[in-house]
Amino acid sequence: MKLNVDGLLVYFPYDYIYPEQFSYMLELKRTLDAKGHGVLEMPSGTGKTVSLLALIVAYQRAYPLEVTKLIYCSRTVPEIEKVIEELRKLLSFYEQQEGEKLPFLGLALSSRKNLCIHPEVTPLRFGKDVDGKCHSLTASYVRAQYQQDASLPHCRFYEEFDIHGRQMPLPAGIYNLDDLKALGQRQGWCPYFLARYSILHANVVVYSYHYLLDPKIADLVSKELARKAVVVFDEAHNIDNVCIDSMSVNLTRRTLDRCQSNLDTLQKTVLRIKETDEQRLRDEYRRLVEGLREASVARETDAHLANPVLPDEVLQEAVPGSIRTAEHFLGFLRRLLEYVKWRLRVQHVVQESPPAFLSGLAQRVCIQRKPLRFCAERLRSLLHTLEIADLADFSPLTLLANFATLVSTYAKGFTIIIEPFDDRTPTIANPVLHFSCMDASLAIKPVFERFQSVIITSGTLSPLDIYPKILDFHPVTMATFTMTLARVCLCPMIIGRGNDQVAISSKFETREDIAVIRNYGNLLLEMSAVVPDGIVAFFTSYQYMESTVASWYEQGILENIQRNKLLFIETQDGAETSVALEKYQEACENGRGAILLSVARGKVSEGIDFVHHYGRAVIMFGVPYVYTQSRILKARLEYLRDQFQIRENDFLTFDAMRHAAQCVGRAIRGKTDYGLMVFADKRFARADKRGKLPRWIQEHLTDSNLNLTVDEGVQVAKYFLRQMAQPFHREDQLGLSLLSLEQLQSEETLQRIEQIAQQL
């Protein structure tokens, strides 16, 4: 249908629309009109993706000079594929309405691992190996040698793309990863470089967060993108952690040993080249004196090691004299390596700021700050000059150079923690140097500054006001939306006591208490008897899950549960988990019913939707606090308190509740879906925890469901499931939670829609 959203004509590819979708579009349009950033929380399963695409594409067509591109960032490959499918639907609706093909290009971009079609490269399992192999076939000097001698290994797909692919832009249309690969096979072009080349003139680009947030990748892929773009971070409740990970470096003893052998290899190569081709080293020296940035010289295939710091921090001047010649630079790296090794020989934990680390470095081995800043850039130049084909082997040394560049660039927002052993195994010496970023706003700041509108959206962003604080930006709109329901299809409840009135909680003091573990077991047992099909249960950590399940086994509870449903368990091994998931779904299909035991913050809690009968109940055993004894976390909490005045307890509770909401939100994936949300811990009933749940869950959490015993919870569940079992047709939803075009235009409906969004 065609909608009028605040004066903008929007094509919406379905016959009916949810009221909150319309409300969401209104907020989005306000954000785009103001050319500012927005934070929007929309309940899961209410068609967030299609509303975003429909509105922004309509905006692009109405104001082609204002918004030139939509950059849609999602987390996992399946999510990227989902967005592309929605976009395809939207475009075919446009074409059907207008009766002509639109000059519109939308495509997905992923890593070489997901896009490469070269027969020698595709069988490799790990992304790092694929990148290394690709580089060894496409680097400019490899190609130059191939021009001389055609028998040498090369990549014909890249050669073809280089000759023909650049002249012919991608034909208009929507391309997911498989479409790109199919096109590559047909034309004989490399799909990965074709996609990277095409994002510059595409109308919609869908890719992963890292392409914008990780400076090492963003520098290669996204730096040409125009300012007049709208960036959407979908499922962005975890965005601060992505920012922090992209700027942090961990160095272990093993990494440093491998750095040593990397340096030895480079030393030998330099000596060999000195004897055979000294001119090459002289040319490099001259380039470094002139201070040319390597990037402009190197072709796209070579620019493999990008600078780990943000673009505005990279120095544009010549490389310092002390590291210009190859031998001097290798000697410099050796001194740095020896110093870091020496620092790892500690007996107790050390925590210090980057300036303190640098002054120690200057005193011990006379290394100044300035040459350190050029480390990453200088190593990139050296590996290029020495024509090192497989860069994957040099990743330890690259890591060390990245650390050197980061530690000398940033004085604030980072901390260095040296731990002599892992807390869990204090007897085994396993020293690690954590160079940890504590300020999430560092990585995302260039994105906010460069693009005119950035939208952060997810189903679980409560409390909204904490995101602008920790990411340090000023949104023009902040809104959270409720779920309009014709029947209440979610039933959240907090179970705080067992049938024997013992308070149940996963807190440290009562964690080992046999009565608490027994009551948790009883809860699962009784729920498995009344809930049809699938139940997903989340524990706070792998360790806690293992000890609880072992205890249930001894008490004979597991045996009783298995009479009702089959049990599957998520483990830390990805392959095992996917088999468990597959079998879990099979058991739900067969009507045998199944229970999946998994972990908050694990793979299952983030990216997997339990649609309809795959998840009729989600049980959250305990409050999923992060491991609070971690020193990195303590340093970050201190930083948040000093810089942004966020109290430690507030942040920890916020973090736990966003993960809890993320877990229970897996059950509701649409308005026709229904599910129980069981919070099994008495602490959830406290106002500070409950108030941090998303508004659409809070609204249905009645006072009568706050501190139930297991029996009372089971009674509530029975009553709810009996109601949900009544036939439910689309007609029941019309006018309430599903609107046709006529209904949408009535005054009364528009007033109701006004109340859906709650601005902050």
Swiss-Prot record:
PTM comment, free text: ISGylated.
By its UniProt entry, which InterPro entries does this protein fall under? ATP-dep_Helicase_C, DinG/Rad3-like, DNA/RNA_helicase_DEAH_CS, HBB, Helic_SF1/SF2_ATP-bd_DinG/Rad3, Helicase-like_DEXD_c2, P-loop_NTPase, RAD3-like_helicase_DEAD
Q: Which residues bind ATP?
A: M42, P43, S44, G45, T46, G47, K48, T49
**Location, primary (coarse class):** nucleus
Which residues belong to any copy of the Helicase ATP-binding domain? 7-283
Per the UniProt record, which residue ranges are transmembrane? none
Catalytic activity reads: Couples ATP hydrolysis with the unwinding of duplex DNA at the replication fork by translocating in the 5'-3' direction. This creates two antiparallel DNA single strands (ssDNA). The leading ssDNA polymer is the template for DNA polymerase III holoenzyme which synthesizes a continuous strand; ATP + H2O = ADP + phosphate + H(+)
Q: Which domain of life is it from?
A: Eukaryota
Q: Which UniProt keywords apply?
A: 4Fe-4S, ATP-binding, Chromosome partition, Cytoplasm, Cytoskeleton, DNA damage, DNA repair, DNA-binding, Helicase, Hydrolase, Iron, Iron-sulfur, Isomerase, Magnesium, Metal-binding, Nucleotide-binding, Nucleus, Transcription, Transcription regulation, Ubl conjugation
Q: How is the cofactor bound?
A: Binds 1 [4Fe-4S] cluster.
Q: In the Enzyme Commission scheme, what number(s) does this protein have?
A: 5.6.2.3
Residue span of region Mediates interaction with MMS19: 438-637
Mention any Pfam family matching this sequence.
HBB
Which cofactor(s) are needed, names only? Mg(2+); [4Fe-4S] cluster
Residues binding [4Fe-4S] cluster are C116, C134, C155, C190
What this chain does, per the record?
ATP-dependent 5'-3' DNA helicase, component of the general transcription and DNA repair factor IIH (TFIIH) core complex, which is involved in general and transcription-coupled nucleotide excision repair (NER) of damaged DNA and, when complexed to CDK-activating kinase (CAK), involved in transcription by RNA polymerase II. In NER, TFIIH acts by opening DNA around the lesion to allow the excision of the damaged oligonucleotide and its replacement by a new DNA fragment. The ATP-dependent helicase activity of XPD/ERCC2 is required for DNA opening.
What the entry lists under PANTHER family is as follows: DNA REPAIR DEAD HELICASE RAD3/XP-D SUBFAMILY MEMBER, GENERAL TRANSCRIPTION AND DNA REPAIR FACTOR IIH HELICASE SUBUNIT XPD
Q: What family classification does the UniProt entry report for this protein?
A: Belongs to the helicase family. RAD3/XPD subfamily.
The protein's name is General transcription and DNA repair factor IIH helicase subunit XPD
Which organism's genome codes for this protein? Mus musculus
